[in-house]
Amino acid sequence: MDFITINSSNKTEEFALKQVAKQATSSLMYRLGKTIILASVCVEREPVSEDFLPLVVQFLEKSYAAGKIPGGFVKREGRAQDFEILTSRLIDRTLRPLFPKDYRYPTQITLMVLSHDIENDLQVSALNAASAALFLAHIAPIKSVSACRIARIDNEFIINPNTSLLNQSSLDLFVSGTKESLNMIEMRSLGQKLNALEEPLMLEALELAQKSLKETCTLYEEVFTPHQNELLFKESQAIVLNERLLDLLTNQYFDEIIKGIESSALSERENVFNEIAKKISEAHSEFSLEEIEWSLEKVKKTEIRRMIIQDKIRPDKRALEEVRPILIESDLLPMAHSSILFTRGQTQSLVVGVLGTDNDAQTHESLEHKTPIKERFMFHYNFPPFCVGEASSIGAASRRELGHGNLAKRALETSIKNKEQVIRLVSEILESNGSSSMASVCAGSLALYASGVEIYDLVAGVAMGMVSEGQDHAILSDISGLEDAEGDMDFKIAGNLEGITAMQMDTKMSGIKLEILYQALLQAKEAREHILKIMHEAKEKIVINFSHLPTTEIFNVAPDKIVEIIGQGGRVIKEIVEKFEVKIDLNKPSGEVKIMGNKERVLKTKEFILNYLHSLDQELEQYAIDEVLEAQVKRIVDFGAFLSLPKGGEGLLRKQNMDRCQVVLKEGDSIKCRVISFNKGKIALDLA
């Protein structure tokens, strides 16, 4: 067993090698403060034949890590929580570009959180633990990678803030990469205001992150290299393409390949290439269908990249900086609180907005919070198969859908003025040809406005791409699905005219240089300004139907009156809700009553509640202490009997008073009682 301590970027990390899980290809125990993560890498020895990287990353939180027992009926960890899925994606997107393109061995990376002290960053810790375990496994020539988080407090950037500092920050920037370049970025603005960050400041933050990553990665390589396993897989698994077949495709079928490239829809493009493959297979039996399909993909990709780099033209004939045509429609769904249909080229997002009460907020359990937290702004993204012409059923939300919804939420969250308002936006992707998450951001921002939600500003999103060949590269604005598939970078950027509120960068290369990222940021700003201009024009045409929107009325009563509004077993409040068709939130300690619904019904509900409480007070005023009266048994309970009083209202005769007099009562009996006290609006009785 070996112990390694590394000090870098405001943190002291400890690694225990060969201590646990020794049957894995590699494993380690990572420690930062009182946060402990078990990282393991397992690799199959037989490669798969399919053309993809068979990598699976799983990040798992254990409730005991924070001294908790899982909430809910089943006291065992079950389905992965959103944070676990998003963190798994974060690590996967960082590590995937590091693998050789011909690597085909099934690989599983597992991160288990065994202890967490709340203050240390779980995502940075998990990624660094995964990176170290992968580097030690030495399954292929893979560079060391690390992560850091940048916060901004009082105009000062802070590297790797703890949770307390991050809660004070206006910026949450997560960056991972090697010592030479960046290969994954997640960013969002934080705080009560919009806090969009300008491009020059974003570059400054990224430069700081790059410096931190270089320091950490250099230390990792120096310290971990002596402990690496022997290189596991040296031979190449790359498919060798037939040169004669490539010549045949280039000379005889090139025009048909160009036709397929220029097809806008994925289904249409696939049909064209399937027909080409079928035609060649029938005419040239010496080539297998698999060989033909591989070669077709190679020729297609080479030509697309050549067009972009050399001809400065894209498959759909757009210029490199050109955004596809945009059409915005509003108020399509009469029963929703808002609905916006945003169409950009062949990508179409229908975002529907609904406002709710505090009871509608999503509750989450988290290791990073001592008590369950309420998510008041929800953004759910759905990608049904028909949006790309696929004939398959719709199932549960995928990792990708959760990730895209989270990105859109992060882009819009700080634009909302009232952070206590409960809002749910749902993006239904009806057509997709790239940049659907950014279309969701645009439609979502307008849907907030159309719902009557007060916002600081509209937010627009655009996906940027890049194609790189040697020393040459081209930045693309508003990438299509084909450009995303054949390009080297997917850089989603959202914000307003002043700056950026969220961004996400992934790459298929081992990393992207800062100067290229900054060029993409500036080009994205131009595209964003163009989109925002169209969105502002659409905003002016939106007519907010305030009569249809729910309104909220908040008032206070004496805290001891809340139980009267609830009633026995919730009977009174259920009747009120059913009668007036509203939602009611009650706060017992403060006496606050919050009613939400149609404006007219809300006002009638408030009037009813106040009149109801007043009538109860009047009933009490009719009786005096020591007054003797004839009452009727209304219902028997474990602790006594509730009696109907002759002048209205009811009183409680407690069981001990009945037992003292050896009286046995049944419902409907009449009995003489004496008023002995008034307590919190209740009349206490004794036998006369």
From Swiss-Prot:
Occurrences of domain KH (ranges): 550-609
Record-level GO BP terms: mRNA catabolic process; RNA processing
InterPro entries cross-referenced by the UniProt entry: ExoRNase_PH_dom1, ExoRNase_PH_dom2, ExoRNase_PH_dom2_sf, KH_dom, KH_dom_type_1, KH_dom_type_1_sf, NA-bd_OB-fold, PNPase
Principal place of residence: cytoplasm
First-level EC class: transferase
Top-rank taxon, per record: Bacteria
Organism for this UniProt entry: Helicobacter pylori (strain P12)
Function: Involved in mRNA degradation. Catalyzes the phosphorolysis of single-stranded polyribonucleotides processively in the 3'- to 5'-direction.
PROSITE patterns the UniProt entry points to: KH_TYPE_1, S1
Cofactor: Mg(2+)
UniProt-annotated location(s): Cytoplasm
Binding-site residues, Mg(2+): 484, 490
Family: Belongs to the polyribonucleotide nucleotidyltransferase family.
One annotated GO molecular function: polyribonucleotide nucleotidyltransferase activity
A cellular-component GO term for this protein: cytosol
Reaction catalysis annotation: RNA(n+1) + phosphate = RNA(n) + a ribonucleoside 5'-diphosphate
EC number: 2.7.7.8
Gene (name only): pnp
Alphabetical keyword list: Cytoplasm, Magnesium, Metal-binding, Nucleotidyltransferase, RNA-binding, Transferase
Protein name per its UniProtKB record: Polyribonucleotide nucleotidyltransferase
Domain S1 motif: 626-688
